[in-house]
Amino acid sequence: MARMHELFHYLKDNKGSDLHLAAGLEPRIRVHGSLESVAGWSTLTHEALLSLLREICSEEDWADYMKCGDLDFAYGLPGVARFRANFLRQENGCGAVFRIIPEKIIPLEDLNLPKAIESLAHLQQGLVLVTGPTGSGKSTTLAAIIDKINNTYEKHIVTIEDPVEFVHKNKKSVFSQREVGEDTESFGAALRAAIRQDADVILVGEMRDLETISLAVTAAEMGALVFGTLHTNGAANTIDRLIDAFPAEEQA
């Protein structure tokens, strides 16, 4: 078993949410908000950590990481989970953080959310934003809503993410899951294409810039049901963030 796979198994078995690796430190996992050392592992040197990370990285992605010092991608370990990976370069050497993504999408009914949330899956058009800080469950909530649509309606659903997190299987709906940097140049390019691809539902992984926000609003105005995420706290802050993304002359 690859040593990275050992760490992924440990993360899942100990109900952790994130795995942190950094040169000069022992591996740690986040459990209920606190970072805990991984049992049986000692401090990782820069060279040892590079060797670990190389185990799960394609030649092309590794070349990008060596050149740019940052890399985002998703990695799947069958029977365990998928992992959202971020490689980085820092003052003391290399580092990486992995967020665990469950292999199976949790049904909306099992998330103990308000009943009103389920009604979002039955909307025909509009813009729905799921907001909150990192780790608050935005992706899990959206995956459950999209899965509800998939089980209920015959729709064309386009997801645009960086990277793709939850993998959806075609049930009643048909999916086009696109990864920024792999399947499309940018969120904006994929959104423009989705409008031309007869998309009924569009999931935007992150409303990160003016172009993405503007195109998402346009897609909703044209009849699509658009879901997206923002790192904000509360509805009022979300409205402010959306408005502030536009130039002053367009905010009125």
Language model feature labels by segment:
Residues 1-252:
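Short, flexible helix-loop junctions that flank or precede catalytic/ligand sites
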